[in-house]
Amino acid sequence: MGEADVVPTPWIYPADEPDPEEALAAPEREEAIEAALDAALELDPAAIRDLYEVLLPPPSVGEGDPTGCPLLLTYDYGTAKAFYWQGECTDSLGTTFSGMGYASWFEKAQFDDGVLADGFDYSLSGRIEAADGTWLEGAGVISSYYAEGPDTHGFGRAIDGVYQAGGPRAPDNVWLTSARRPSLRVDGWTYRPTQGTNLTLTGGLSGLDGFPGGVTAVSFEAFTMRSATAASPCPSEPGGLASIRGPSGAWVDVSFHGLTDEAPKPDPEACDGCGDSFYRGAAAGPTCVDPSSFLDWEGDEPW
């Protein structure tokens, strides 16, 4: 058999894979992280809670009805109150319930060191629709709190899940009308004597549209920004991890050098405002984010 002869084979070999797409450029990574931070500071669980309460006003303790529409149970925990509902029914007002939910709220709950806190947690797995066509549906949990201490004001907001709403009484709110899919928590505090500020983000946002570079998702892990007036040794750079998913579905991870609660003493020589980026396991250059504009708020909270 000559060298030019070809021996048939029963195997089918896949075509060579194309070269992987290049990582997003640094400006696109930076703009996407900053856009996600802007969105995080617009996180609005209260808009969802308010519509929830329009459709299902919170009952007083003792007003529950385990045989009604919907099944409704109430709880009294002192400074906290709660209720649970479940049903597939239409009540006497024409409101239709399908699914289940839980809500709790607390006022002046006392914690260590004289801290007093107010807040709420609401969950929904299903749909509620009023007779006038106003509706809310979703699957997830929302929460919000603020806490008062002798010198510090703390706060936090979270949306974990997707909510949609419509009808004449539904608000025009991005967290109820867009394709965004949040699983994001934002916590922070203000130290009043020096107006020192701190923000920490955990979780992410997907289903993004119109973000720089076609980015479709951004996630954060212990992503912390703290001002110089809050005694940060590295106020010019965040700490923690940010990850950006490009239009191809591949992620770029950015590890920043600032402080986090787990690592409060960052290397001062690495504190240059830029994190180290990695794409498909290889270094992809620096990504720089200036936290100052996100920490410069008046009063106790950035919202």
Regions found by a protein language model. Give the residues of each.
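Low-complexity, intrinsically disordered segments exposed to solvent
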Residues: 1-303
